[in-house]
């Protein structure tokens, strides 16, 4: 496993041993970032169910302004931190060790506090791109996370024009809509698929 492009191009990344973590393949990651390329530089990126952090690190390598990693499995967290340390990435990221739900709730609370204040939500609290890759068999995780992102509460942490991408089994299609999130395309590659969502136009 390696970084595909950018400032850390070709640098190796580690993954925990065993079958507990299923990192996004280099090929699928390359396909993903070929599509996202025009949006990456300067963006705020959320890598949910981040595992080894390979997707978020790829975003940093390609110029993302800030990446939020959400992961709670200790073996994956250890690999993620080792990868960040090996690449000497010391800033421009936040790791939420309590998992995806905790990160989204934390950002939603910050957005709510900011909306009640005299000043608007600070740009760094808003997300341009979200990538989520739960265990493929965990349908409840997709429903919970996509449902939250598609709700009014979730919408408060997404910039207008934000994109949400979910990796899942190519044999199990995701719903075309989660609240205000509407599926725009699905790309299949072997056993994996990427489904892209955008906020519905008001």
Where are these regions (language model features)?
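Class I S-adenosyl-L-methionine-dependent methyltransferase catalytic core
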Residues: 1-202
């Amino acid at each position: 496993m390696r970084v595909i492009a950018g400032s850390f191009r070709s640098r190796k990344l580690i993954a925990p041993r065993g079958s507990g973590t299923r990192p996004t393949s280099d090929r699928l990651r390359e396909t993903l970032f070929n599509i996202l390329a025009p949006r990456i530089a300067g963006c705020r990126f959320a890598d949910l169910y981040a595992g080894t952090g390979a997707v978020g690190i790829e975003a940093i390598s390609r110029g993302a302004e800030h990446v939020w990693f959400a992961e709670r499995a200790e073996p994956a967290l250890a690999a993620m931190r080792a990868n960040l340390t090996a690449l000497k990435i010391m800033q421009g990221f936040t790791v939420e060790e309590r998992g995806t739900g905790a990160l989204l709730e934390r950002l939603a609370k910050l957005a709510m506090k900011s909306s009640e204040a005299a000043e608007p939500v600070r740009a760094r609290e808003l997300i341009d791109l979200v990538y989520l890759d739960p265990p493929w068999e965990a349908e409840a995780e997709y429903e919970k996370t996509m449902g939250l992102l598609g709700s009014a509460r979730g919408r408060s942490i997404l910039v207008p024009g934000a994109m949400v991408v979910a990796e899942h089994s190519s044999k199990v299609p995701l719903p075309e809509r989660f609240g205000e999130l509407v599926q725009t395309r699905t790309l299949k590659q072997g056993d994996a698929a990427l489904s892209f969502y955008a906020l519905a136009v008001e």
